[in-house]
Amino acid sequence: MVRPGRDRLTGEIEVDETYVGGPEEGKRGREIEKKSIVVVAAEKNGRAIGRIRLKRVKDVSGESLLDFIREAVAPGATIHTDGWKGYIGLPAAAYKHRVTVISGGDEQAHEVMPRVHNVASLLKRWLLGTLQGGVQQQHLDYYLDEFTFRFNRRRSSARGLLFHRLAQQAVSVDPAPYSSIIYGTSALRG
């Protein structure tokens, strides 16, 4: 649903990672094993949230995070992150990097980087409300694309144009046959 080759985010961008999936007893943050890691990038638009990008990554290593940022954010942008070591390579990759270490200080993460945390909260609430908490990991990338599409067009005044854009995108990407969605393969099962 997200247009291939779409424009990258520009200006000032907040980037952080969140975890999507069911609850795990006694585990928090980066200790989580069964949840999927989703990187969130939110464009700053004054006090509001501009466009967003979301992507599931295999881990929170510098390589995974930089791959996402190169794909989602135009070079030269200012990227605001927490103190996680995975973001240390941003200046070498042609990005300005603003770090706010959030570890037991007076300021909470959602106060320092409100846009990215609002998007993560809305995503989780949307998944819970729409899918009743039944997020199947093999479909998560499709859910993230749908959420991104809807979020980035939330203030659109041209509803007809929205449908036109959706139809354009539907015919410009490879089809996802029922068998590949249900069984994870393009071969029909008998």
Summary of predicted features, one role per range:
Residues 1-190:
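Residue-level recognition of single "structural anchor" positions
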